[in-house]
């Protein structure tokens, strides 16, 4: 089965079947965050740095970095954001942009083996992104839509994913370095959105043997109490074979749900990570043997 290895200057992370589910922190993204966007545009990266540290401390094994700000110098801002993040945390980065010049600027600044986020199945996009992926020996997120749009049929999305994997091979990019995004749609608008993704992830795993990722919170868009849906959705994705996702690790219940998914699928063997994360420390004066004697006397 495929394993996708990403790295920072000092640390490797493996995305793959049988490995812990990889949480890619989503917070360094100015979309919908007016204060962050204004700060980044003005050259203030203090919030970027704080978000990087907080997400890694919360359990993120990778970070997504996006600098998509209207009327700003995205290539320069993305490169500087990456430099600032790499100065304070040691996890690998997903370099997130739809602007080819920004992707190249980010890749040139990055120390390690990055994940490029992303390409679609559109021929023009493939021909611009894949040469960069090869040039910088990166891996790439493959979004399973093309010129025809997003199909509700998992089989059509599978065809797009297969097309991307085949095009990547033409550039010398191995299947294990293509991480497919099956596209999570809002379940409030498409009642079968969850089942569509589960079916497609299983098919991608069994037939293409590629790793997968997604923007998991898309599933709850427009609904109340979104965290409840997100927290249920992620273990189901893990059970279907999803190997990573872009998430907000600052929600402890979501991190716990992901770790529970690893436990229940046998990846967290012996529940080692679960126990080390959630075992309550013994209270001062606690003595299990004394407690057992007390119970016997009672």
Where are these regions (language model features)?
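Domain-level signal for soluble alpha/beta catalytic cores
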Residues: 1-179, 185-298
């Amino acid at each position: 089965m495929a394993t996708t290895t990403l790295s920072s200057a000092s640390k490797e992370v493996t995305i793959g079947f049988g490995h812990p589910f990889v949480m890619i922190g989503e917070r360094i993204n100015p979309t919908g965050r007016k204060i962050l966007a204004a700060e980044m545009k003005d050259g203030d990266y203090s919030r970027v740095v704080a978000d990087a540290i907080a997400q890694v401390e919360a359990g993120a094994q990778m970070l997504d970095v996006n600098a998509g700000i209207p009327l700003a110098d995205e290539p320069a801002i993305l490169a500087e954001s990456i430099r600032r993040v790499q100065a304070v945390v040691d996890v690998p980065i997903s370099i997130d942009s739809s602007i080819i010049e920004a992707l190249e600027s980010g890749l040139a600044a990055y120390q390690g083996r990055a994940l490029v986020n992303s390409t679609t199945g559109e021929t023009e996009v493939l021909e611009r992104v894949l040469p960069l992926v090869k040039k910088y020996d990166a891996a790439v997120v493959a979004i399973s839509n093309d010129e025809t749009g997003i199909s509700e049929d998992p089989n059509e999305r599978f065809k797009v994913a297969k097309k991307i994997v085949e095009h990547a091979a033409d550039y010398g990019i191995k299947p294990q370095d293509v991480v497919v995004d099956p596209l999570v749609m809002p379940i409030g608008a498409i009642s079968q959105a969850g089942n569509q993704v589960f079916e497609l992830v299983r098919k991608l795993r069994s037939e293409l043997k590629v790793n997968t990722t997604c923007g998991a919170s898309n599933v709850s868009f427009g609904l109340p109490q979104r965290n409840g849906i997100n927290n249920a959705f992620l273990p189901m994705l893990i059970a279907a074979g999803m190997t990573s996702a872009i998430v907000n690790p600052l929600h402890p219940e979501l991190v716990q749900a992901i770790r529970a998914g690893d436990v229940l699928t046998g990846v967290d063997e012996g529940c080692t990570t679960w126990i080390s994360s959630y075992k309550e420390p013994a209270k001062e004066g606690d003595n299990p043997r004394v407690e057992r004697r007390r119970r016997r006397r009672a």
